[in-house]
Amino acid sequence: LRPTAPVADNTVIRYERSGGIAGRTSSWTIYASGRVVDGAGVETKADQAKLAALVTIARDPKTLALTSPAGRGCPDCFKYTVSIQTPGANVSLVTYDGVTNPPELDALLLALAEVTR
């Protein structure tokens, strides 16, 4: 038997938070390798434990089956846009402060906040 190279994890997560009192937009692209690039192009390395938790949630079939919850923005609220690209699926989700999200989406948003702090 010939050893095979490990399969690269090509999971990419794009996360944008916009609105709030100041009306600001912040965005990040997070790679499973740990590379995090913010909207200004500044690159950092994610904490490995926080990244592992995020990637596990993002690749969960329940997360990949989500659709955006019904809801709309409100004054001074944040809008959250998340796109997940995996080798087998592409998902885009939008939600807002004050919307009742499925538990999988809440877990994803919490993990994203941890990685992008």
Feature roles, as predicted:
Residues 1-20, 42-45, 49-52, 56-57, ...:
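Short, well-ordered, aromatic-rich surface patches in folded extracellular/luminal domains
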Residues 19-31:
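Short, solvent-exposed loop/hinge segments that bridge or flank secondary-structure elements
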Residues 28-42, 89-91:
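Acidic/histidine-rich, surface-exposed loop or edge segments in extracytoplasmic proteins
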